[in-house]
């Protein structure tokens, strides 16, 4: 199956093509297949797996976004065996090979094939009354330490997502030792750091937020809350005079955001995001809140409304008279980050193959830039190009290309908001690119590529000599682990910018690790192998996250 997909579609976004375009091309010529029945227990298992593994790309209601529409109207035309094979083998365009990687058992693959042929489950809403029942303050502010009670270099701590165990590991970046492992929500998507640097806020895909106090002798969660059934984003207020006052969380389901007290996570307001698409003005039931960032120019949170293509500037200076500014941008907004000046925000509209540039000082759209197939930058990578000046880089899920966009409209206006150069990487399935102001290297992962050699290694470019192409670092081999896919995901620098950390992400039943590379020499420096490091994915250095260094 994989050879067939690769041969027909190469590095294009094959998952979208196969699940969407094939139906359009053949339509009713594909025979209707009877839906194999699911028992109640099987449906519950399938629904749980879908929410944990699939909803992020395909949507809670399965109507598609980064991934294609997989409602039964489409999947039944493809048929059970076709769907089962696709789940098993994946595609070079970003669809993981759930079966051959070992992430799902053969039984689970079979259940999921039947699940996506079945009618869509309607999830419940999650209102303020529901949210309040989950709110817990384990350590009230008045009982927390007045000053730091440990000897850790807080700015060089890494918060590491342990995806499938519902935990984060805090790792000392100086000693490479695990400080503690903290129970959180399931599959923490991101860690964000308060303006003061004292607190780490983490949010699980199940909508649970934990607030971790780094001043404690052993850092731990001091408050928690569940803001929805499915979520991806959390942020804190950072504008001068408003530091640490508020936190905000954005939900995939229900489509809403919640602003909370920054000391306790007490929910203060809940605002729904349902509305019309920016272009066709069609009402949408599921405009999910994707990335949220804190403005450097005024007391505002800036958030992406994925399906409807709008970016909201939410003024948190007066919650009782809430003011929002809506920027009409592009549909299927996902993630992104600031340029070097932190004035302009670049966000990926990945299903539209575009990057949206927003001027956060003026709260206006600056430009929309066409890039390669399904851009997925994480927060992107800023560096000084030897020819074009400051650029921001994004890799892609759908092909092997890395797009470099000029980001200096003041001193290099001729290059601003244009793709000034395109680099060719190892393949599709990339989730993150990363560099550092002190680094001469640009690192590109390919974690979701179905080719094991590509998924288990990293491409690295010399910023001063991009024409040379990339070198390959065999991170999976360096880990010493022999089993599994050993997907290498999310390069992350330490505070000093002289080390880069990589997650070696295996299935829950297999060994995983963290590999640390000397940035200057590109040589292996250290491997963290510990039975507590289970399915590590995202890693967030406190200093770099707090100061938007990427």
PLM-predicted stretches and their roles:
Residues 226-307, 320-328, 333:
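Asp-box/WD-like beta-propeller blade repeats and closely related beta-sheet repeat scaffolds
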Residues 212-217, 260-268, 315-319, 360-364, ...:
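Short loop/turn segments immediately following beta-strands, especially the blade-tip
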Residues 389-393, 400-402, 427-509:
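Loop/turn-rich, solvent-exposed surfaces of beta-rich toroidal or solenoidal domains
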Residues 177-182, 218-225, 266-271, 275-282, ...:
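A short beta-strand motif characteristic of beta-propeller blades
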Residues 22-49, 143-146:
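Electrostatic cytochrome c docking/interface patches
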Residues 135-152, 192-195, 234-243, 282-297, ...:
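Structural signature of eukaryotic scaffold interfaces centered on beta-propeller domains
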Residues 167, 209-211, 255-259, 309-313, ...:
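Structural motif
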Residues 36, 40, 56, 61-65, ...:
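Extracytoplasmic electron-transfer domains, predominantly the class I c-type cytochrome c fold
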């Amino acid at each position: 199956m994989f050879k067939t997909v690769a041969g027909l579609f190469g590095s294009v976004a094959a998952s979208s093509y196969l699940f969407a375009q094939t139906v359009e091309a053949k339509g009713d010529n594909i025979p209707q297949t009877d839906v194999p029945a699911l028992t109640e227990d099987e449906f519950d298992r399938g629904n749980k797996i879908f929410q944990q593994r699939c909803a992020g790309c395909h949507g809670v209601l399965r109507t598609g976004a980064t991934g294609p529409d997989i409602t039964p109207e489409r999947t039944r035309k493809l048929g059970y065996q076709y769907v089962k094979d696709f789940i098993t083998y994946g595609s070079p365009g970003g669809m993981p090979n759930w079966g051959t990687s070992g992430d799902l058992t053969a039984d689970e693959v079979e259940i999921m094939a039947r699940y996506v042929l079945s009618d869509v489950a309607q999830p419940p809403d999650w209102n303020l009354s529901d949210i309040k029942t989950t709110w817990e303050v384990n350590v009230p502010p008045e009982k927390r330490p007045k000053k730091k009670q440990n000897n850790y270099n807080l700015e060089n701590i890494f918060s590491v997502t342990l995806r499938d165990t519902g935990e984060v590991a805090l790792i000392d970046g100086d000693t490479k030792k695990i400080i503690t492992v903290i129970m959180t929500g399931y599959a923490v998507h991101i860690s964000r750091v308060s303006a003061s640097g004292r607190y780490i806020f983490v949010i699980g895909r199940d909508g649970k937020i934990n607030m971790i106090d780094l001043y404690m002798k052993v850092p731990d969660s001091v408050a928690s809350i569940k803001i929805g059934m499915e979520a991806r984003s959390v942020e804190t207020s950072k504008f001068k005079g408003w530091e640490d006052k508020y936190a905000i969380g954005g939900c995939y389901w229900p489509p809403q955001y919640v602003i909370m007290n920054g000391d306790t996570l007490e929910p203060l307001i809940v605002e729904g995001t349902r509305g019309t698409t920016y272009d066709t003005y069609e009402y949408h039931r599921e405009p999910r809140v994707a990335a949220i960032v804190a403005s450097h120019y005024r007391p505002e949170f800036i958030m992406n409304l994925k399906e409807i293509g709008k970016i909201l500037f939410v003024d948190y200076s007066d919650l009782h008279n809430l003011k929002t500014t809506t920027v009409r941008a592009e549909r299927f907004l996902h993630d992104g980050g600031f340029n070097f000046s932190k004035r302009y925000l670049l966000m990926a509209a990945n299903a539209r193959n575009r990057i949206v540039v927003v001027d956060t000082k003026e709260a206006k759209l600056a430009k929309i830039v066409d890039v390669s197939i399904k851009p997925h930058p994480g927060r992107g990578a800023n560096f000084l190009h030897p020819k074009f000046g400051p650029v921001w880089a994004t890799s892609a899920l759908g092909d092997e290309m890395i797009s470099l966009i000029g980001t200096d409209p003041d001193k290099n206006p001729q290059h601003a908001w244009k793709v000034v150069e395109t680099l060719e990487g190892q393949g599709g399935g990339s989730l993150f690119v990363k560099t550092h102001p002190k680094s001469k290297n640009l690192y590109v992962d390919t974690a979701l590529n179905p080719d094991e050699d590509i998924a288990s290694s990293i491409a690295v470019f010399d910023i001063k000599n991009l024409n040379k192409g990339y070198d390959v670092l065999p991170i999976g081999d360096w880990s010493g682990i022999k089993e599994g896919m050993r997907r290498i995901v999310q390069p992350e620098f330490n505070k000093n910018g002289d080390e880069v950390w990589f997650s070696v992400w295996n299935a829950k039943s297999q060994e995983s690790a963290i590999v640390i590379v000397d940035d200057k020499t590109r040589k292996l420096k250290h491997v963290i192998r510990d039975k507590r490091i289970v399915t590590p994915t995202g890693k967030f250095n406190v200093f770099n996250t707090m100061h938007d260094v990427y």
